[in-house]
């Protein structure tokens, strides 16, 4: 296929806009500003915002009842539910199709990079989550211990085992679950991908290049969360929703540390230090991902209104919008 035919094929595909970036850089605000200018509906790409009642610690948008202000994939699960990247991909694809059929453009915004990657490049055909199998596996792991479980994984799939830490109990459990459910090792299954995303996409990365400025934003944001009642939010989840540290929702930064504090595992000062440190590490990890990302426009954010204008102008220049 020559270049012109390839371009024509892409231009005939339904459109989508991706806004990703480091944590605390103003992605959501930029998306909200763009929504006032563009024929879009917003889809959240955030592994924390899917959970009901987890509002302050995820810096969740203030979702109004009006359908015109609707965010998709926000408040769709209880904190004790299991929601995987596979679930996200299926849900996001269905919503993107519905938005496109309305003649609108899906605008996906968030910082969960693996979610974005799953949309763009597909996922391996892994066995679906099964609570009964998981409980049986947990029972077996409790009998033999985490170390022996890791040694077993290393024996059956040394490649996958070499890419995870022995103390990464979540990924270790998932790897063993895949093996016992399918009879195949994770490394082999990860080679087979589902279909890639057939959309004409414009991707934007919102970045803050000055680490001191970014880390100050992260620190200030967390202290605002504490001021706005984050402790009470997690207390409610702990007491009323019976959440515990082993649930996927409690892997979210801030919730994990606050729950540890409320359970008496760490003190208040440690909770603050550990949360800010973990968020800084996340921002660094996101930056590493994004620097390697293909076909992306980097927007260095000093002001959300200026950044949204930059994005709008790029879309206009590319004839992506009328």
From Swiss-Prot:
An example Gene Ontology molecular-function term: ATP binding
EC number(s) given by UniProt: 2.5.1.75
Gene3D superfamilies the record matches: 1.10.20.140, P-loop containing nucleotide triphosphate hydrolases (3.40.50.300)
Site for Interaction with substrate tRNA, residues: 112
Cofactor(s) the protein requires to work: Mg(2+)
Keyword flag Cytoplasm: no
Binding annotation for ATP: 21-28
InterPro entries: Dimethylallyltransferase, IPT, P-loop_NTPase
GO annotation, biological process: tRNA modification
Keyword Cell membrane: no
Family, similarity comment: Belongs to the IPP transferase family.
Function summary: Catalyzes the transfer of a dimethylallyl group onto the adenine at position 37 in tRNAs that read codons beginning with uridine, leading to the formation of N6-(dimethylallyl)adenosine (i(6)A).
Assembly notes: Monomer.
Protein name as catalogued: tRNA dimethylallyltransferase
Organism expressing this protein natively: Wigglesworthia glossinidia brevipalpis
């Amino acid at each position: 296929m020559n270049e012109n035919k390839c371009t024509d094929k892409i231009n005939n595909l339904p459109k989508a806009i991706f806004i990703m970036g480091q944590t605390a850089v103003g992605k959501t605000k930029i998306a909200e500003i763009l929504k006032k200018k563009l024929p879009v509906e917003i889809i959240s790409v955030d592994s924390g915002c899917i959970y009901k009642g987890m509002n302050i610690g995820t810096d969740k948008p203030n979702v109004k009842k009006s359908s015109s202000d609707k965010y998709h994939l926000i408040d769709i699960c209880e904190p004790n539910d299991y929601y995987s990247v596979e679930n996200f991909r299926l849900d996001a694809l269905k919503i993107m199709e519905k938005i496109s059929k309305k003649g609108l453009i899906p605008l996906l915004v968030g910082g969960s990079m693996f979610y974005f990657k799953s949309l763009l490049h597909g996922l391996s055909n892994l066995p679906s989550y099964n609570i009964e199998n998981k409980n049986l596996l947990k029972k077996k792991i409790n009998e033999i211990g985490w170390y022996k479980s890791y040694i077993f994984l290393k024996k059956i799939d040394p490649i996958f085992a070499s890419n995870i830490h022995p103390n990464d109990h979540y990924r270790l459990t998932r790897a063993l679950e895949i093996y016992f459910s399918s009879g195949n090792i994770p490394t082999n299954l990860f080679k087979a991908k589902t279909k890639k995303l057939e959309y004409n996409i414009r991707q934007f990365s919102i970045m803050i290049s000055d680490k001191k400025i970014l880390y100050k934003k992260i620190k200030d944001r967390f202290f605002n969360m504490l001021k706005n009642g984050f402790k009470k939010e997690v207390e409610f989840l702990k007491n009323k929703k019976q959440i515990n540290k082993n649930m996927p929702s409690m892997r979210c930064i801030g919730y994990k540390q606050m729950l540890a504090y409320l359970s008496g595992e760490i003190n208040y000062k440690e909770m603050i230090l550990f949360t800010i440190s973990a968020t800084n590490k996340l921002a660094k990890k996101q930056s590493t991902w994004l620097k390697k990302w293909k076909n992306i426009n980097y927007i260095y954010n000093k002001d959300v209104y200026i950044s949204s204008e930059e994005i709008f102008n790029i879309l206009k220049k590319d004839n992506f919008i009328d």
